[in-house]
Curated annotation (Swiss-Prot):
Chain's gene name: GYP7
Residue ranges constituting the Rab-GAP TBC domain according to the UniProt record: 434-619
Cited InterPro entries: Rab-GAP-TBC_dom (IPR000195), Rab-GAP_TBC_sf (IPR035969), SGSM1/2_RBD (IPR021935)
Keywords assigned: GTPase activation
Keyword Secreted on entry: no
CC terms in the record's Gene Ontology section: cytoplasm
Protein name: GTPase-activating protein GYP7
Species of the source: Yarrowia lipolytica (strain CLIB 122 / E 150)
SMART domains registered for this protein in UniProt: TBC (SM00164)
Ranges annotated as spanning the membrane: none
One Pfam assignment: RabGAP-TBC
Length: 730
C-alpha cells in the first residue's frame, strides 16, 4: 500500500484520535471539511512537548489506505466497543502528519509551540462545540475545529456509556453534556499543563510561562487542577465560569500578547460569526435531512433536553442562508386557491423592505415655516413604520405619535400646549405631595411600596438610571428613608426620583387603575428619550390609554389578546397550532410578558425604541404587535414542531430567544404575514359571497370578529372599572 509520505520519513505513533472534527471554510455547510484531530508521538521523541497536535482531512488520509485504516482503528479503540478490545495502540504507526497545507487546511504542531486553546462548548444556540489552537507565533493562524459529535462513533459510544452509568454530564458542575472537546482536553492534559485564563475562561493556556499567565491575568497553580475542573471553568460549564470585576487586572489582561493574539484571531472568527446568520425558511431541506440522521435522532431519544438543543441548533444552521430572501409564506392549499383567484403571491422578489430612519432634516421638511404639517399624517406614519425615527427626531416625533401633540397644530400652538401641560402636571403632583400622612390610606401606602420596589430595579443598566451612590443593590436596609418612606438609594439619582414621582402622579391621575407592575418598564424609555418629566408623564398617560387593557385587575385584556392570537395562529399557522394543542401550549403563555410590556425584556434597548414607534403608527393595524408575535412563531415553527415535545420545552425555547431577535427581519416577516392575512380574509369574503349567490347550499367560512378587528387601525381602549373597597393594587 502506498503511504501518504515518503517511507524514509520516520513514522509517528497515534496516541489519541477525534474523528468527525470539521473545518468550516465558508458559512455554507456544503463546504465543511471532515477530518481527524490527532495526538501523535514522533519516533524518537523524548519529552511530551514533542508530541504533535494534528488535524488531517479525511480526503488527504484516504490517499493512503494504510494510514486511513490506522486512524479509524484508533478511533474505534477509543469508542470502547467490544470490537476495540483487541486493538493495540502501541502498534499503530502512521506517516507523520503535514506541518501545514494551505489547500487542505491540514496542520500539525508540537505541544511546545501551542500558546493556548480557545474552547467553545456546544450551547443552546450553537450545535457544534469548537476548539481553536493559538500558536506562540503571531503569524500562524489555525482554523477553528468543529466537533460534529452526532457523527463521531467514539463520542456517541462514550455518551451512551455515561448515560447507562447516570454520568451524562462531564464536568463537576453537572451542567453540560459530554462532547468531543472534553475528550481532547482530557487526553491533552496528560501531556501538557493546562491552565484556565482568569480574565477569559474560554481560554486554556498550554504549559504557560510566568509572563503568559501575567498577561492573561492568570495565577499559576502548578497543574493542580483536574481536567474536569479545567473544562468546568469554561463558560456555561458551571463554577468559575462567570467573570468577576477585576478593575485594573482586566485592563492588564487585555494588553501585550492578548491584544496581539485577539488581533490575529479576528480573521479566523469572522467565519464563526457568518455561519449563525440567515433565516430558517431559506434552506430548510438540508437541515431537516441532517436532523433525520439516525445518530442525531438517537441523541434526542436518549436525552429529553436534547430536543431543545437540536431545535436551537437547527435554527442556527438554517440561518446560513441570506436573511432578506424570505420564502413564500402561503401553504400549498392556500397557494393554489390564491393562484386560482389571480392574486400575486408574496414572494422573495417583492418583499417589503426596511428603510433608513427619518433624519432630523427629513422630519423638518414635513412642516412649513409655521410648524404645521404639509404632508398627510398617513405619509408620515408610513415613513416611520418602515424606517423608524433618528434619535434627534424622537423627542418631538413621539409626542405626535402618542397624541400629545395634535397633527394639525402649529409650533406656537404646541408651545402653548406644553405650558398648559406643565400646570396640569404640577397640579396632579401637588395633590399627593401635600397630603398629610394620616390622609394616606392602606391602598396609597401599598402603591408607594410597589412603585419604590419597581423603580429601584428598572433599567439600572442604563447610564441614565445608574447608581450614583457608593452602596450597591441589596443594601436597602442601610439607607435612610425620606418623608414618603422611600430609601435614599432612589434619592441618589435625580432621574429615579423623577421616575418615582411620575408613577405616583399617574397613580393619583388614574385612581381606578392605579399603579400595576410593569408600568415602570413603559415609562422608562419615554423619560429617557424626552428627558422632561412633564412631557414624559403625559406621553405615558397617552400610551397607557391603549395599554390599560394589559393591566386590568381581572386580566381580561391580556386574555382577549392571547385569545385573538390563538385564533390568528389557527388561521395562519394551522400545522403549528395542531402541535401546540398536542403539547398543551395553546395558552400561548410565553407571549404574556412580550405583550404586557411590548417586548421590553426581549429586545435590546435601541430595538425597543424602534419597535414602539413602529407600533404607535397603527399604519396597518392598531394591533400589529400580534403580527409581531405571529412572526416569531412563523420563524420558529419548523423547529418547534420537529423537536419540542412539551410545554416546558416550548416555554424554555421561547424564553431563550430574549436578546437574540433580529428586529428588522422580524418586522419584514410581520408585515408579510399581515398582507397574507388581509388577502386571505378578502378571498374568503369573496368565496362566501359566491356561495350565497349559488344554489349548492355550502356553508360560508366564518371569520371571528376579533380577527376582523385586526384589520382596523382604530386603537382599542378599555378602562378599568371602579376599584372595590379594600382591593389593593396590582
Amino acid at each position: 500500500m502506498n503511504s501518504l509520505w515518503p517511507v524514509s520519513v520516520s513514522h509517528t505513533q497515534l496516541t489519541s484520535i477525534n474523528h468527525q472534527v470539521y473545518v468550516h471554510p465558508t458559512p455554507s455547510s456544503k463546504d465543511n471539511i471532515p477530518g481527524f484531530l490527532a495526538l501523535a508521538k514522533p519516533r524518537g521523541a523524548t519529552t511530551d512537548k514533542e508530541i504533535l497536535v494534528a488535524w488531517i482531512p479525511e480526503s488527504k488520509l484516504q490517499e493512503s489506505a494504510a494510514d486511513f485504516e490506522s486512524y479509524v482503528k484508533v478511533d474505534i479503540k477509543e469508542s470502547g466497543t467490544p470490537a476495540s478490545s483487541s486493538l493495540n495502540l502501541a502498534e499503530t504507526l502512521v506517516s507523520p502528519p503535514p506541518s501545514s497545507s494551505f489547500s487542505s487546511y491540514a496542520f500539525s504542531i508540537p505541544i511546545s509551540d501551542i500558546f493556548s486553546l480557545q474552547v467553545k462548548q456546544p450551547s443552546l444556540g450553537w450545535w457544534w462545540g469548537s476548539i481553536t489552537i493559538h500558536t506562540r507565533s503571531k503569524e500562524d493562524q489555525l482554523p477553528p475545529l468543529y466537533f460534529h459529535d452526532a457523527e463521531s462513533q467514539s463520542t456517541i459510544m462514550e455518551q451512551k456509556r455515561r448515560n447507562k452509568k447516570f454520568e451524562t454530564f462531564d464536568s463537576e458542575s453537572g451542567s453540560s453534556m459530554f462532547w468531543g472537546g472534553d475528550h481532547f482536553i482530557q487526553v491533552l492534559s496528560k501531556y501538557a499543563n493546562l491552565e484556565r485564563a482568569e480574565s477569559d475562561h474560554s481560554f486554556l493556556l498550554v504549559n504557560p510561562r510566568e509572563g503568559d499567565a501575567e498577561r492573561f491575568g492568570t495565577n499559576l497553580t502548578g497543574g493542580s487542577e483536574e481536567p474536569s475542573q479545567l473544562v468546568a471553568g469554561i463558560p456555561g460549564r458551571g463554577a468559575g465560569g462567570d467573570p468577576v470585576d477585576r478593575g485594573a487586572q482586566v485592563q492588564k489582561a487585555f494588553s501585550d500578547i492578548r491584544w496581539g493574539l485577539l488581533s490575529n484571531l479576528a480573521k479566523v472568527t469572522q467565519l464563526t460569526r457568518k455561519v449563525s446568520q440567515g433565516v430558517w425558511d431559506s434552506s430548510p431541506q438540508p437541515v431537516k435531512q441532517l436532523l433525520m440522521k439516525p445518530e442525531v435522532k438517537k441523541i434526542g431519544d436518549d436525552f429529553d433536553s436534547a430536543r431543545i438543543y437540536l431545535a436551537k441548533w437547527a435554527l442556527s444552521v438554517a440561518e446560513e442562508s441570506q436573511r432578506a430572501k424570505l420564502k413564500v409564506l402561503f401553504d400549498d392549499e392556500l397557494r393554489e386557491l390564491v393562484s386560482d383567484e389571480g392574486f400575486e403571491l408574496i414572494d422573495a422578489e417583492n418583499n417589503p423592505q426596511r428603510r433608513n430612519e427619518v433624519s432630523l432634516a427629513e422630519w423638518n421638511a414635513f412642516f412649513d415655516y409655521n410648524g404645521r404639517l404639509i404632508v398627510t399624517v398617513n405619509e408620515v406614519k408610513e415613513r416611520i413604520f418602515h424606517g423608524g425615527l433618528a434619535p434627534a427626531v424622537r423627542p418631538e416625533g413621539w409626542l405626535f405619535l402618542l397624541g400629545v401633540y395634535p397633527w394639525d397644530s402649529t409650533a406656537a400652538e404646541r408651545k402653548e400646549l406644553v405650558s398648559k401641560l406643565r400646570v396640569d402636571y404640577n397640579r396632579l403632583k401637588k395633590e399627593w405631595w401635600v397630603q398629610e400622612d394620616k390622609e394616606r390610606d392602606d391602598f396609597w401606602r401599598d402603591q408607594l411600596s410597589r412603585i419604590e420596589k419597581d423603580v429601584h430595579r428598572t433599567d439600572r443598566n442604563i447610564t441614565f438610571f445608574a447608581e450614583c451612590d457608593a452602596k450597591k443593590d441589596g443594601d436597602d436596609d442601610n439607607y435612610d428613608k425620606d418623608e414618603f418612606g422611600f430609601s435614599s438609594q432612589i434619592n441618589s439619582n435625580i432621574h429615579l426620583i423623577q421616575l418615582r414621582d411620575m408613577l405616583i402622579t399617574y397613580n393619583q391621575h388614574n385612581k381606578n387603575l392605579g399603579y400595576v407592575q410593569g408600568m415602570s418598564d413603559l415609562l422608562s424609555p419615554l423619560y429617557v428619550v424626552l428627558q422632561d418629566d412633564t412631557l414624559a408623564f403625559w406621553a405615558f398617560s397617552a400610551f397607557m390609554e391603549r395599554m390599560e387593557r394589559n393591566y386590568l385587575r381581572d386580566q381580561s385584556g391580556m386574555r382577549n389578546q392571547l385569545l385573538c392570537l390563538d385564533h390568528l395562529v389557527q388561521f395562519m399557522l394551522p400545522s403549528l397550532y395542531k402541535h401546540l394543542e398536542k403539547t398543551e401550549s395553546t395558552n400561548l403563555f410565553f407571549f404574556f410578558r412580550m405583550l404586557l410590556v411590548w417586548f421590553k425584556r426581549e429586545l435590546l434597548w435601541d430595538d425597543v425604541l424602534r419597535l414602539w414607534e413602529v407600533l404607535w403608527t397603527d399604519y396597518l393595524s392598531s394591533q400589529f404587535v400580534l403580527f409581531v408575535c405571529l412572526a416569531i412563531l412563523d420563524k420558529h415553527k419548523d423547529v418547534m414542531i420537529d423537536h419540542l415535545a412539551g410545554f416546558d420545552e416550548i416555554l424554555k425555547y421561547m424564553n431563550e430567544l430574549s436578546m437574540t431577535i433580529d428586529l428588522d427581519e422580524l418586522l419584514v416577516r410581520a408585515e408579510l404575514l399581515f398582507y397574507r392575512f388581509r388577502r386571505t380574509v378578502e378571498l374568503i369574503d369573496r368565496k362566501n359571497e359566491d356561495r350565497r349567490n349559488s344554489a349548492d347550499g355550502s356553508e360560508p367560512v366564518s371569520i371571528t370578529e376579533d380577527l376582523r378587528e385586526l384589520l382596523s387601525r382604530k386603537v382599542i381602549v378599555v378602562r378599568e372599572g371602579e376599584r372595590p373597597e379594600g382591593v389593593m393594587g396590582g
